[in-house]
Amino acid sequence: MNIQSNNSPNLSNNIVSKQVYYAHPPPTIDPNDPVQISFPTTEVVGHGSFGVVFATVIQETNEKVAIKKVLQDKRFKNRELEIMKMLSHINIIDLKYFFYERDSQDEIYLNLILEYMPQSLYQRLRHFVHQRTPMSRLEIKYYMFQLFKSLNYLHHFANVCHRDIKPQNLLVDPETWSLKLCDFGSAKQLKPTEPNVSYICSRYYRAPELIFGATNYTNQIDIWSSGCVMAELLLGQPMFPGESGIDQLVEIIKILGTPSKQEICSMNPNYMEHKFPQIKPIPLSRVFKKEDDQTVEFLADVLKYDPLERFNALQCLCSPYFDELKLDDGKINQITTDLKLLEFDENVELGHLSPDELSSVKKKLYPKSK
């Protein structure tokens, strides 16, 4: 693999040229053959623990892209590139190219050239919070459907758990209400025989089984995180704002009550004999006073202690909560059509279902007339 110096001389108009590799090479291209692209140097538009993100335009195609630059830490396994090369879905940010470069300190950086989206869901929500107006319930519903659609593909087709679902990792276009899942730096293909680290996922969105130290958790941790995202969009602030790992559990118990012995067993059997203060749950209808029964019931199905009782991504998509998006009804139907919301590749996204299950799911997924 070609590793370039990152101090390539700039042209007079600040254009840099790089040899890059296709993430999804066309049939006529050998994946090991680099292609040359050029783009203007630009300023940073985002940063995190992983590194920095630049926005720029590929000169050859006039395509706006984001370039995520990640230090290759030899102590940790970087699965992000290999996982992103596997993925192709309308609601997952597309990896177009990648290249490696070495800096003057001999550090190696992986550069991921990604599809560009205008902002994160976190930024979109902040806009409404600053305006002191709630986000439209219809906009929330569209974002959540697309999130669960991406997770259904990720969990069932790719067998990948994202492990860091939060508003900052959901990119949106506020004009079209399109949503795409990004940042696969924590993602992993979970195997039942292989333990996983429990200290994963940002605190406010951490599933209770992670807080209980489970190492054999499942893709269902992403569903809990998604429920926390939805709650935050409705409330305008995090539902469980813990100040530490244990305080996070306290915040959850304050609303959902003390988990039962059976629920604790499902999360982590090692805590079965642990004595917890007995707290009664608060009805979610009191937490979400402005929401209808259908919304509250849906959140109750997603925010369950027991990962086996928690809805999976496909059950979420089939929930009556989303029926409004499936109506053959003017404006809503147009948004649904434009976002290709109800277009599913049955071999890929629904391929894990038996014929009877597929028939039942299709009745719930596809458009309904009023």
UniProtKB/Swiss-Prot annotation:
- What GO MF terms are annotated? ATP binding; protein kinase activity; protein serine kinase activity; protein serine/threonine kinase activity; protein serine/threonine/tyrosine kinase activity
List the SMART domains: S_TKc
Which sites bind ATP? V45, G46, H47, G48, S49, F50, G51, V52, V53, K68
Q: What is the role of this chain?
A: Serine/threonine protein kinase that is thought to function in regulating kinetochore activity and entry into meiosis. Could phosphorylate IME1.
Q: Name one GO cellular component term.
A: nucleus
Give the free-text miscellaneous remark of the entry.
Present with 6990 molecules/cell in log phase SD medium.
Family membership:
Belongs to the protein kinase superfamily. CMGC Ser/Thr protein kinase family. GSK-3 subfamily.
Annotated active site residues, numbered on this chain, are D164
Q: What PANTHER family does the database record attribute to this sequence?
A: GLYCOGEN SYNTHASE KINASE-3 ALPHA (PTHR24057), PROTEIN KINASE SHAGGY-RELATED (PTHR24057:SF0)
GO term, biological process aspect, one:
cell differentiation
Q: Which keywords appear in this protein's UniProt record, sorted alphabetically?
A: ATP-binding, Kinase, Nucleotide-binding, Phosphoprotein, Serine/threonine-protein kinase, Transferase
Q: What is this protein called?
A: Serine/threonine-protein kinase RIM11/MSD1
Q: E.C. number, please? A: 2.7.11.1
InterPro entries hit by this protein: GSK-3, Kinase-like_dom_sf, Prot_kinase_dom, Protein_kinase_ATP_BS, Ser/Thr_kinase_AS, STKc_GSK3
Tagged with keyword Mitochondrion: no
Regions annotated as coiled coil: none
Q: Which residues carry this modification: Phosphotyrosine?
A: Y199
The EC category is transferase
Domain (Protein kinase) ranges: 39-322
Q: Tell me how this protein assembles.
A: Interacts with TDA1.
Reactions it catalyzes: L-seryl-[protein] + ATP = O-phospho-L-seryl-[protein] + ADP + H(+); L-threonyl-[protein] + ATP = O-phospho-L-threonyl-[protein] + ADP + H(+)
